Design a protein with these regions (language model features):
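Non-catalytic terminal accessory/regulatory regions of metabolic enzymes
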Residues: 1-90
Length: 90
């Protein structure tokens, strides 16, 4: 089946990236940084860990659909107290 379509209509593909806010301590990122240094990757100066979601939605990536993705990300995919998010068409 061609990219961007499914039997019965168009499919929009959206990538949502969720990251801890900069002021939130990231122990997992720090552990990865220590491992990088231990393994000889001394040029790695910092690591922040996050989540990536790939959504397939019925329809086209118009203003209405992107607004719904923002609602979904803010209510389900991210914890707005400690995380921020960004999304884009894939």
């Amino acid at each position: 089946m061609p990219r961007g379509s499914r039997k019965g209509g168009t499919v929009a593909r959206i990538v949502v990236e969720v990251m801890l806010k900069p002021e939130i301590h990231d122990p997992q990122g720090e552990a990865i940084l220590r491992a990088c240094q231990r393994l000889g990757f001394g040029d790695v100066l910092g690591v922040r860990q996050g989540k990536r979601f790939e959504l397939e939605l019925a329809g086209t990536a118009d203003e209405r659909l992107l607004a719904r993705v923002g609602e979904l990300a803010g209510e389900l995919l991210a914890n707005p107290v400690i995380e921020g998010f960004a999304f884009r068409e894939a």
